[in-house]
Amino acid sequence: MENLKKRFDVLQDLLMNIYEQGSDTLESQIEHWQALRREAVLLYYARQNGVLRLGYLPVPPLATSEAKAKQAISMVLQLQSLQQSPYGTEKWTLVDTSIETFKNTPENHFKKGPINVEVIYDGDPDNANLYTMWKYVYYMDDNDQWQKTESGANHTGIYYLIGEFKHYYVLFADDANRYSKSGQWEVRINKETVFAPVTSSTPPDSPGGSRELPGSTANSKASSPTQQPQQACSDETTKRKRYGRRESSPTDSRCRRRSSSRQKKQGRRARSRTRSRCSSTQTRSRSTSRRSRSTSRGNRRCRGDTPRGQRGVSTSSRGRGRGSRRSSSSSSPTPRTKASQRGCDTRSVRDSGISPGDVGRKLQTVSGRNSGRLGRLLEEALDPPVILLRGGANTLKCFRNRAKLRYRGHYKAFSTSWSWVAADGTERLGRSRLLVSFTSFKQRSGFLDLVRFPKGVDWSLGSFDKL
């Protein structure tokens, strides 16, 4: 007991000397965190042996000491890594290397030079928020090398530069939805207005902004009525979330359920108009009735993009049954789009059917065992399946390194992390992406059953013509 108390007093004297000296070298900051680590380990050992007080200091619970020890170990590793970089010789104070600064937005980055950014909503000085913009931000790139960059602010938010890309770590529109009534705000830096009042509509080139692909305007005019509920649903999702989701993402299930009833009603009207334009022969009547049943099932999960002028083709691009094959063969030949062959992975290929022109797009040779000649042709027509992961760059990179060893044999390949870039600029949009490819849909299903994705990482399904 006395020996334990003496060691604890020595650590307290060491910490007091560090605080009194106020050194601004990185070596002294590493020494400070090493002392905090030893202090947490000593308190953990004391509590584990039933000691409840060391001098006048109560011994904290085991969980508290363990958390502080792990926190100190993490900071020591980060500072030692920074010490090996060209920025290790700069001035580093206790505030610059504190856990509060390191965990502040942007998280897990070293930062220097805090600057106050005031955002005033609706022109009311009493209705304002204060944000911290850091003059310099130190981050680790994909090659595990420390980089130093500058931070800035505009009408969209506060960002730091990664090369020529702007990575936003504060978006003013997020708080404007809660605090602003008119959707307007102005930005002040050091009590000087740098941006006049703007509305809360997110600019197209900012993260979370809606962006149309070329030809999307023309396609929206010619789309069937079944698309209108999903377009309104996607607009609502863009306003509510920072990053857009694909329809295959699990986060959009609630949005699809809300519009399913409207899709059914409008789908019936669209099919009735399609049948009125089709030939009145008995064969096409039977195919239309069968197609309507398969379409009603397909519309629950897949979205249709059928042009109005296309005769005898199902309004759902993925709800294909035997009737849809018969009707498409009786009409004029129409090439199928690539999007109509993706998404509904859980449906059987034998039930849905694939046209002969699509056979041969799969990269891997399919075994004909227990499937027959027809089943092998249908399987060969499928595109290679993939999983798209979205999350932080470091999180995705760590997950890839662990999964490559832990789940070997349950996937084909991993990609490096990448990001979307704005069409009219060089800004990165949203979070980082990572692709996982598979040799078959069965392998992908087994991978999803086996793997547990990290917190904050979402995924969606897809496929490509070639990898």
UniProtKB/Swiss-Prot annotation:
- Comp. bias regions, Basic residues: 255-276, 287-301
Concerning Gene3D superfamilies, the annotation shows: 3.30.70.330, E2 (early) protein, N terminal domain, subdomain 1 (1.10.287.30), Papillomavirus E2 early protein domain (2.170.200.10)
UniProt-listed InterPro entries: E2/EBNA1_C_sf, Nucleotide-bd_a/b_plait_sf, Papillomavirus_E2_C, PPV_E2_N, Reg_prot_E2, Regulatory_protein_E2_N, Regulatory_protein_E2_N_1, Regulatory_protein_E2_N_2
Q: What Pfam families has UniProt attached to this entry?
A: PPV_E2_C (PF00511), PPV_E2_N (PF00508)
- Any single GO BP term: viral DNA genome replication
Report one GO cellular component: host cell nucleus
Q: Where in the cell is it found?
A: Host nucleus
Q: Where is this region: Transactivation domain?
A: 1-201
User: What top-level branch of life does the organism fall under?
Assistant: Viruses
Biased segments, Low complexity type: 197-210, 277-286, 309-318
Provide the primary localization.
Answer: host cell
Biased composition regions of type Polar residues, renumbered to the chain: 216-235
One Gene Ontology term of the molecular function aspect: DNA binding
Please describe the post-translational modifications of this protein: Phosphorylated.
Which keywords, in A-to-Z order, does the entry hold? Activator, DNA replication, DNA-binding, Early protein, Host nucleus, Phosphoprotein, Repressor, Transcription, Transcription regulation
Query: Record's family?
Result: Belongs to the papillomaviridae E2 protein family.
* HAMAP family the record matches: PPV_E2 (MF_04001)
Query: Could you tell me what this protein is called?
Result: Regulatory protein E2
Q: Which organism is it from?
A: Human papillomavirus 24
